[in-house]
Structures are given as C-alpha cells and as structure tokens.
Amino acid sequence: MANASPLSPTNQHFFQPLLPGFQSNLKIPVNYFSEHIEGKHEGKTVTLRTDASERTWEVKMEGHRLTEGWKEFVEAHDLRIGDFVVFRHEGDMVFHVTALGPSCCEIQYPQSSRHEEGEESGENEISEKEGEENVQKESDKSSSDLNCFSQSVTHSNISRDAVSVPRDFVKRSGFSKGRHEIVLMNEEGKSWESEVKSYMSGAVYLVGGWTTFCTENKLDVGDSCTFKLLQKAKTPVFQLCSRTKHLPLSFTKVNGLINPGKIILVDKDRAEWSMMLKVDSRGAVYIIGGNDWKSFCAANEVGAGESLALELIQGGVLLNQITTCFQMEQPSFKAEDGRHKRARVQNRSQETDKGAETSRASTMGPKLEITEKGEPSRASTMRPKVEIREKIAETGEPSRASNKSSGIEGNLQHTKPCSVKTDQLAKVKESVVDTLTSIGRFQAELETMKRKLEDSLQELN
C-alpha cells in the first residue's frame, strides 16, 4: 500500500465541501461510489484516518453516505461549514482524510503524542520538546510564574476563530480534558467570552472570540502575544500581558513628561512610527505602540533583550500635550557585543516661525544617566543647549555621561521635520498589487468550486 502509484485505484481521490447538515452524514459522490466502491467491497464500514493523530475512526456506510461514527470524526477534527475534506482511498476501504479551511489551505493540527519506534520517532520527540521549551522561555520572560503562554497570530487561526493552546500550559493549568468557559481580557480590562476545548486527537484549542479579540486589539498576522491565566475569578481569565514600554520615573519627572500625548518615532532614514504616551494612576509613563513599536525595532535591528538608549531634546508643550520625535542614529563605534543601540528623542514644537528653533535649543535640560533598571546613577547640571540622554547598558552597569560638542548643537538646530520616505509609498503600492493578485486567484478558485458544486447538484437531480 505504501508503494502504490498515485494513479493506481488504491489512491483515487474525491472531495466534498461541508454544507449545512454535514455533521450527521456525508455523501460520497455518485460517480466515485459506482466506479470504486459499489459491488467491489462487501464491507459496510469504512476506516478513516488523518495526520492529526494515530487514532482511526470506523464509520458506517449506508448506500453512498457515511453515517454512524461520522459525527465523532467531525467533532474530533473541529470541522465546520465552509471547510473541505479530501478523501484518498488507500485500499480495503481505508481512507486518508485531509481537511482544508475556507481559504483552501490545509488545516494544521498540533502534533499529537506519537511514539513510533526508530530514529524518526526520536527526532519528533526532540523537536516537540524543543518547541515546549521555547514556549516556556517566552512565558518566563513575561511572568515570574508558570501561568503564562505565548502564541502567534496566523491567517489560519484568524479565519477559523480558534488558536491552539501549548500542551505544557494545558497540563499545568488543568485544561487538558473537556470544555471550559474562559474570558479573554486585554490590558485595559475589556473582555471577550471564549472557551478552551480539547479534542479526541489530543489537541486543545481556544475557540470563539479570538478573531474579534485580535481585531479590536490591533493584533496582525505575525504578531506574538502572551497571556497570563488569572484563576481567582469564577470564570478563568486569560489576560493579555502588557505590551507597553516603561520610561524611568526619574527621567520623566526631570524632563516634564507627565502628561499623556502623541509621540512619533523617526529613525535615521526619517521613517515614522506613531506612538502614544500613557500615564497610569501611579504616575508611571509608558510608550504604547503595539505593532508600530515592533516595526520600529525591526527596522532598526533592535532585538529582544537588547538595550536601547534614548536621547531627549527638550521642546515646547502645546495644549498640555507633548509631541516628541525619536530619531535613531547609528553609533560611531561598534559595541563590544554588537547589541547596544542608540536613539535620539527630539521634541517637535508645532510653532512655524523661525524663533521655534532657538526656543527649542534654549530649553535643554541636564544630562542624566540611568542603569538598565531605570535607577539614576549620576546626574549633573550642564550648560544650556545640551541634550538629555538616557543610556542603558546591556549589562546593567551605569555608563558615563559627557558634554555634547558644539557640532552636535549645530546638528540639532538643523534637524528637519519628520517625513515619510518615498520607499514607504512604494511598499504600499506593492501591497495593493499583491492584494489584487490574491483576489484574482481567489476568484479563479471560486469559479472552480462553483463548477464542481453545479456538477454535484446535477448528480442529485
């Protein structure tokens, strides 16, 4: 059977779209049934298997319909209206079933606990352990306990409104069996109803509310989010861990960053990212950027665990709203471990007269050094027209501060307003073209599907 040719009778295929009512039974196409099953097999049951688990399902066949046992197969694989199933006959009434989502892409299920003999099994187990260790490391970064798990947003889990839950988290938290109502909660306390559901294949999914949660919290495909389990409430709560960036309190007080407002991050190429300053009830100031912060770090090669020095040039305050501009600049030397980054933070005054430049330069504050934890190490009063720089060393040790030269002052006075690069427009244009191409491809797939459904309808008539 393993050596059968793809064109041999034992490898004949048929597929069916899942329409309303499919949960109770599934029809085998008349032509396929008459050519490959009718009169050639005495058995009244078929065996179904998938790549989702080692288990097989015995399903009763009444005429050319799959009936008793089909519902259990559907529930085990979370099949839904709009999905497609492809059956490959492997001989002796054994069918391998592949499930496709509405996007016509194969549905991916978490690997089950398969313990086959031989070298291949060993490799699978190692790979699985490594995956669990990676998830554990991500959790450790976000919380001091083990009640966290991380997951990425994908096209598949968005379209299916369901996302898999890591196996190690499931074991720790007791969600490995049955169905459990839960609540998804964002950083601001807004909640969405959902549930954790386990399947016979061993897979555990967070089902319902996922797509809405991602949309309203501006989580895009490729983003990673970490949830912390709060079990004190009657219904378990999966709370999204903070994606904000905390600014040291000593730094914000000295520089008057005490009010919420809009900020714009600009790198050396003057590409812009819009962020917000948020002040909590304790007076702590955060940068909230979500995907924009992630894009900013990626564009400037700032990775997880790396230090980032911020350099603030004090500016004017307008309507109690501070508008700042972070300008990334490449250091003139390469750090010992290659991981130190520097950024310049420049306030943009909204005045348009020529005196704005002079006003901005004359309000420069003292130079402040802080450790990685945000604790002040040494501060000294400097002459006017110098920058306030926040340096964070990778090792957490305080760095030494020095006066900026007059050449730097000259550069500050000639800083140009933040602007969007032309290459960004090119990227937008390219994205639109790609979207139109995808739409055309999808329309072609719909036409093919339409013809097949019309053929099926003719068979029914």
Curated annotation (Swiss-Prot):
Q: Basic and acidic residues compositional bias: what residue ranges?
A: 126-143, 384-394
In the record, biological process GO terms are: response to cold
DNA-binding region boundaries:
11-103, 148-244, 230-332
Main location per the UniProt record? nucleus
Source domain of life: Eukaryota
Pfam families for the chain:
B3
Task: Read off the InterPro entries from this record.
Answer: B3_DNA-bd, DNA-bd_pseudobarrel_sf, REM_fam
* Keywords on record: DNA-binding, Nucleus, Repeat, Transcription, Transcription regulation
- Give the protein name, as stated in the record: B3 domain-containing protein REM9
Q: Which organism is it from?
A: Arabidopsis thaliana
Q: What is the lineage of its organism?
A: Eukaryota, Viridiplantae, Streptophyta, Embryophyta, Tracheophyta
